[in-house]
Design a protein with these regions (language model features):
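Glycine- and aromatic-enriched membrane alpha-helices
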Residues: 1-410
Length: 410
């Protein structure tokens, strides 16, 4: 934290709480989209991430991903179990550790939507910490202070490190896991749109901490990121329902919710670097791109159950690349970057090139290692539930409980 005064520390702590609140929001969002017999499994997959990742983060994650005394590729273990981190800076470092730990927790949770309805919870329990250490931590280091950042790529709050990373990992995971029984012949509509909309509202609320909190202070850049987050989400949701209205004859609640999330994803990498009407354009472009991208799974036959690839991978990639066009050098605050001008603000292709390189590296690393982790799990403990469990539902088969009891209605 550049200036750990009481106001800045307080804002980062509040932002950390907002980001934590996003995980149950994501659980509701995914849970509502899932089927009644699997909704508790989806909730558990999300909440498991906030059980195991904070412990892993304090043990080694923060030290490996953020320690400045490592190198441009990986940190070291000097801050193992927060060794040496005290209150000498008014608690500023502890606040940042907590804040970034919330990011680490929600990132693997994003992947859960792609593998819905058929992944063993035992495999998920191993996948989450292993993936976080081998995939998330290195990419986070490279993007935020490591060699990709030193080259000049920009990522304000995690478009590349979180959304592109988790989105392409979701694709690798479903390619190993295989399709759900009956997909795509059988439709799998959301079982509860009210849950989806509640989850969307919670995500939108929490995302202000996700993006504005990444300024690491209560300052002008935080206000800028806050406003950009608000505008991009609205524009993307609008773009999605307008496309639906024209194409299908009606706007849907699911389309509005998906569009809002797509806009939130897309503005994440750019929130602190763009100004004026730029977030509206980013939202409109991302909303349209993701609206069409979610249909690619049917064309190419990969069963991304809850559209993680179409929304998070595509949305994050679009938002990150658009920095190369919309970055405004007058709105970088204290961010030191080799390239600050987008093409529309007097820049050249160098920033766009660095954005493309950073995302390309993240895509290759994340896909390859995720695929390898899933293959290893498949050959050892197995990754897919038995046919009977998939048919009866993962809630009863894996957790011994159900979300809805008919007896409770009497």
């Amino acid at each position: 934290m550049p200036d750990p005064n009481s106001g800045n520390v307080a804002w980062v702590l509040v932002s950390a709480a907002l980001v934590l609140f996003m995980t149950p929001g994501l659980a509701f969002f995914y849970g509502g989209m899932d089927r009644t017999r699997n909704v508790l499994n989806m909730l558990m997959m999300n909440f498991y991430c906030v059980l195991v990742i904070p412990v892993l983060w304090v043990l080694v994650g923060f030290s490996l991903s953020q320690n400045p005394f490592g190198n441009d590729w990986i940190g070291n273990l000097d801050a193992f179990m927060l060794d040496g981190i005290g209150l000498g800076d008014n608690g500023g470092t502890l606040a940042v550790v907590a804040y970034l730990g919330m990011f680490a927790a929600i990132t693997p949770a994003l992947i859960s939507g792609a593998v819905a309805d058929r992944m063993k919870f035992s495999a998920w329990a191993i996948f989450v910490p292993v993936w976080s250490l081998l995939v998330y931590v290195p990419i986070f280091k490279w993007v935020f202070g490591g060699w990709l950042f030193q080259r000049g790529s920009l990522d304000f709050a995690g478009g590349t490190a979180i959304h592109v990373n988790a989105g392409i990992a979701a694709l690798a995971a479903v390619l190993v896991l295989g399709k759900r029984r009956g997909w795509p012949q059988e439709g799998h509509p959301p079982h509860s749109m009210p849950l989806v909309m509640i989850g969307t509202g919670i995500l939108w609320f929490g995302w202000f901490g996700f993006n504005a909190g990444s300024a690491l202070g209560a300052n002008g850049q935080a206000a800028q990121a806050f406003m950009n987050t608000f505008l991009a989400a609205a524009a993307a949701g609008l773009a999605w329902i307008l496309i639906e209205w024209k194409r299908d004859g009606h706007p849907t609640n699911l389309g509005a919710a998906s569009g809002i999330v797509a806009g939130l994803v897309a503005i994440t990498p750019a929130a602190g670097f763009v100004s004026g009407a730029s977030p509206i354009w980013i939202g409109l472009i991302a909303g349209a791109a993701c609206c069409y991208a979610v249909r690619l799974k049917n064309r190419y036959g990969f069963d991304d159950a809850l559209d993680v690839v179409g929304v998070h991978f595509v949305g994050g990639l679009v938002g990150s690349l658009l920095i190369g066009f919309f970055a405004d050098p007058d709105f970088f605050a204290g961010v030191v970057a080799p390239f600050r001008e987008g093409l529309f603000y007097g820049g050249n292709l160098r920033l766009l090139g660095e954005q493309a390189l950073a995302n390309g590296v993240a895509i290759v690393w994340s896909f390859a290692l995720t695929f390898g982790i899933m293959i290893l799990l498949k050959k050892t403990i197995g990754v897919r539930v038995e046919v009977e469990a998939e048919a009866t539902g993962l809630d009863l088969a894996l957790h011994g409980e159900t979300a809805y009891h008919s007896g409770g209605l009497h």
